[in-house]
Amino acid sequence: VTSYTLNEVVPLKDVVPEWVRIGFSATTGAEFAAHEVLSWSFHSELGGTSASKQS
């Protein structure tokens, strides 16, 4: 089994509106594959308040 990890910090405040929806997408071309998101986290700081989501 091959395992890959993606970890990237992206400053979104300059490129997306205040309210957004985040999605995941993956492909293998013509072949079938199953992809799993085993965990994710989100952190936001707006005007001195902060919100976090860990799943």
Swiss-Prot record:
Protein name, UniProt field: Mannose/glucose-specific lectin alpha chain
Organism: Lathyrus sativus (White vetchling)
GO molecular function annotations of the record: D-mannose binding
Keyword Glycosyltransferase carried by entry: no
InterPro entries to which the protein is assigned, alphabetical: ConA-like_dom_sf (IPR013320), Lectin_LegA_CS (IPR000985), Legume_lectin_dom (IPR001220)
A Pfam family this chain is assigned to: Lectin_legB
Subunit structure comment from the entry: Tetramer of two alpha and two beta chains.
Swiss-Prot/TrEMBL keywords: Lectin, Mannose-binding
Family the entry assigns: Belongs to the leguminous lectin family.
